[in-house]
Amino acid sequence: GANKDYLNDLWEYDMSRNSWTQCADMPVAGRKAAVGFAVNGKGYITTGSVKDGSSSYCVADTWEYDPATDTWTRKDDFKGGVRDGALAFSIGGYGYVGTGCNSDATGSESAYKMDFYRFNPNGAEGSQWEAVSGYGGEKRYFGTAFVIDEVAYICCGRNNNTDLVDFWKFDGSNWTQLRD
């Protein structure tokens, strides 16, 4: 809620010991409704909302966490702009982020998003994010994404106080609508 702290801490879970160990905190203000994905043994956090006094605003910064060194590195800002409640997944050595809501949108800018972008962890600075076309689903925020055998599936979420039930899959090249 509005009166709660936004967090920037990171924890690692050891299944064999059933225990948690605190890792290095993100070196930025705490946030909520951010998304994360993992590629090549590193974790990535992007978008979300941060607090500024009693209000909050959406962000687009992207951070890489390296568990081998317990360090964070700033990467290119998410090319799709500020938002929270997006979707994220990784397939084929790339991270993907899309949809979400820019609660700061004004005028003719739509608050709800239906775009997707691919993150290349090996890309040169300034060119790590690239737009991905072909998604024909609804604009949404707080949807669900999962990956099975290098195919991403997305579904659910909300748009203008409407629950969404469309179901899509993405193989890294093509989007296909499945049965709702």
Q: PLM features: residue spans?
A:
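Kelch-like beta-propeller repeat domains
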Residues: G1-D180
